[in-house]
């Protein structure tokens, strides 16, 4: 391999201007993502705003229904991954080779670890909306389709998928919306402390 053949390197072994530009752009993007991490409500309000703008655009243009359907299916897939545990309890239950000694109590606190964390869910959902928005600028994605059929398909798919997910939650007794172990507080001490 001769000098400058590797990706992003110029003839003199230094990174090329284009490579440095995109590296810097990626760093700025990651910095903004890192800064937005603690602001959960603000992030979701912005995403809902983008979603609203997208829906208004589709309504006014009277097209791109197949893109909207694909976006809905993508968001449903993300939501199911968000509600699902990282380790599927049905796989752990089926791995029994025979009788074994109990290793933990049923009531032991086990934190719910999601398959798709909230931040990644938000990030993927927002990127999906932006990609769908970009698709509405190209007529190639405006496939003529009878939109009530797509709405019916989506509602059926949503109901079937959520029914299966709720049955899974009930069967394996997990709730994806807990905020941690319950903390019990003692009685408030109303007496004054005495200094000796």
From Swiss-Prot:
The keyword ATP-binding does not apply. One of its GO terms (molecular function) is acetylcholine receptor binding. Keywords: Acetylation, Golgi apparatus, Membrane, Phosphoprotein, Transmembrane, Transmembrane helix. The modification Phosphoserine is found at residues 2, 6, 10, 95. The keyword Transit peptide does not apply. InterPro entries: Rer1 (IPR004932). Belongs to the RER1 family. Its main location: Golgi. Coiled coil: none annotated. It comes from Homo sapiens. The chain crosses the membrane at residues 41-61, 63-83, 140-160. This is Protein RER1. It is a multi-pass membrane protein. It is found in: Golgi apparatus membrane. GO terms for cellular component: cell surface; endoplasmic reticulum; endoplasmic reticulum-Golgi intermediate compartment; Golgi apparatus; Golgi membrane; plasma membrane. The modification N-acetylserine is found at residue 2. Involved in the retrieval of endoplasmic reticulum membrane proteins from the early Golgi compartment. It holds the Pfam family Rer1. One of its GO terms (biological process) is retrograde vesicle-mediated transport, Golgi to endoplasmic reticulum.
